[in-house]
């Protein structure tokens, strides 16, 4: 390592003083903590009066740690987090500052916590900025696509270490409040830089934090104090409206509470939100309804890919009660003409993905995306799940973020798309035998490659090949959203949607 570790430590202290609310009285303690962690016997002769960008400093720390056998290469991010954790303000200080700011300006409080999350490297912005994203124009609504390059593939040594590590049930999951300060291990990320804010939602303690993955602007999470399964009911809508009243510039939504149509974590009740207007929220209404018991609520079907009912009104209680009524009706609703069955024996299939916010008129809004997770022999992954020919692009469940029109695609797709382009330009011969080998990273795309080669040949220019591959991905994402619609965009589906609205009393 070319830089003196003692000077690197002083750079970290200088950075924390400028960016992590570190008080003058904290410097000696923080310096000694860093000296202890890095096994350095004494500090530099003098503090520094400037520092390099944080990641450059941390790269030096990691190099030093590897040279001195303080951490394995695969432990790099966890070790960085441990270092930064020694420089973080304590939870009480963060909560106090946040609440003082929120008392006069909630937006300023949110900005404070977000900046702290970035400055502490909890949100790894240097990595997140590597993500590739673009907008797709479509007559039924624009969508956004991101290829997630910020999440590195797991190192084989890390996988082996996780397999051999003692199994622990602490914390119970990565959304539990006990994750604040958690040291991490081979199987779980370190969270010494995580800070959460307690908030009251429907008379319960919940905890607010920003997501480390930042899939969209100010991507945040609200999680229940208790480790309990995801569940959507009338209380969900109360909590969501409490949240948007606390933070009026934000939306909040919940993944569905059933497998296949829910998110990746169903074991811990939580919501996701942010300040960005995601594509579905901008979609117009295409058909309006009235209900004699809820005359002051504007009700409509949204002109969007999946099946969405939008409720808007000044009266919070009335909007919430109508949402609860629709949820109750949907939970028990079946229509075999369009493959909707509420239950198989005692297993429920119908649920919703709800999203709450204020509109431009400052009215309460809930968008309810109707979901159904039933499977059958012809659709083993789900009747309203992406069909198997789309699994090379997206096989996982379609959660709230994708349902709202923002696709987060795996980082592997970037290199795989490049490989497909090479076939379309003729750089790589089209060899179906080689593509059929499951060890070939392009094997999952064999159908896509066959279609593109048949339609456009294998003598395209680089630009033409890139366009064809991107167009294919764009079309696949549109089709994926269409798959999730419980009422399809044809005459049969629209009539079925009307029957459900009639069932609800509209």
What kind of region is each of these model predictions?
Residues 1-229, 305-306, 319-323, 329-406, ...:
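Active-site microenvironments that recognize anionic phosphate/pyrophosphate groups
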Residues 192-197, 225-252:
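Helical scaffold of the NTase/Pol beta-like nucleotidyltransferase catalytic core
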Residues 235, 244-267, 273-334:
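Catalytic or ion-translocation cores adjacent to nucleophile or general acid/base/metal-coordination motifs
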């Amino acid at each position: 390592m070319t830089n003196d570790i003692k000077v690197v430590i002083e750079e970290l202290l200088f950075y924390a003083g400028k960016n992590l609310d570190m008080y003058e009285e904290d410097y000696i303690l923080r310096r000694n903590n860093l000296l202890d962690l890095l096994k350095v016997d004494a500090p530099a002769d003098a503090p520094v009066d400037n520092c390099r960008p944080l990641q450059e400093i941390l790269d030096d720390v990691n190099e030093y740690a590897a040279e001195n056998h303080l951490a394995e290469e695969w432990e790099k991010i966890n070790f960085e987090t441990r270092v930064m954790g020694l420089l973080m303000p304590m939870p009480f200080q963060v909560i106090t500052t946040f609440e003082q700011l929120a008392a006069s300006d909630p937006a300023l409080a949110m900005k404070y916590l977000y900046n702290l999350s970035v400055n502490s490297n909890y949100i790894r912005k240097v990595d997140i900025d590597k993500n590739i994203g673009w907008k797709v124009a479509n007559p039924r609504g624009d969508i956004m696509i991101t290829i997630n390059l910020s999440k590195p593939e797991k190192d084989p040594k890390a996988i082996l270490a996780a397999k051999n590590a003692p199994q622990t049930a602490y914390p119970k999951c990565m959304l539990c409040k006990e994750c604040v300060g958690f040291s991490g291990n081979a199987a779980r990320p370190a969270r010494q830089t995580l800070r959460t804010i307690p908030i009251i939602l429907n008379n319960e303690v919940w905890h607010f934090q920003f997501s480390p993955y930042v899939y969209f602007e100010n991507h945040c999470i609200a999680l229940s104090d208790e480790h309990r399964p995801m569940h959507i009911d009338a209380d969900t809508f109360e909590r969501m409206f409490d949240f948007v009243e606390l933070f009026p510039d934000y939306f909040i939504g919940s993944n569905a509470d059933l497998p296949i149509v829910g998110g990746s974590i169903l074991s811990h009740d939580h919501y996701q939100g942010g300040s960005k207007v995601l594509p579905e929220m901008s979609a117009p209404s295409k058909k309006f309804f009235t209900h004699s018991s809820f005359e002051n609520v504007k009700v409509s079907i949204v002109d969007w890919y999946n099946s969405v009912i939008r409720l808007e009104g000044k009266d919070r209680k009335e909007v919430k009660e109508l949402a609860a009524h629709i949820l109750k009706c949907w939970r028990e609703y079946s229509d075999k003409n369009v493959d909707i069955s509420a239950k198989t024996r005692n297993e429920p299939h119908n649920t919703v993905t709800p999203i709450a916010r204020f509109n431009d008129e400052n009215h309460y809004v809930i968008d309810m995306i109707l979901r159904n997770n039933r499977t059958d022999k012809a659709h083993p992954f789900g009747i309203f799940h992406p069909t198997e020919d789309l699994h090379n692009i997206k096989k996982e469940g379609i959660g709230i973020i994708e349902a709202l029109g923002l696709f987060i695609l795996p980082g592997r797709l970037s290199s795989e798309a490049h490989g497909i382009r090479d076939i379309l330009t003729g750089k790589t011969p089209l060899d179906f035998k080689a593509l059929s080998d499951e060890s070939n990273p392009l094997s999952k795309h064999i159908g896509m490659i066959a279609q593109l080669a048949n339609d456009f040949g294998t003598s395209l220019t680089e630009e033409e090949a890139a366009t064809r591959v991107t167009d294919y991905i764009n079309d696949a994402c549109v089709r994926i959203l269409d798959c999730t619609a419980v009422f399809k965009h044809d005459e049969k589906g629209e009539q079925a949607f009307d029957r459900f609205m009639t069932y609800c009393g509209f």
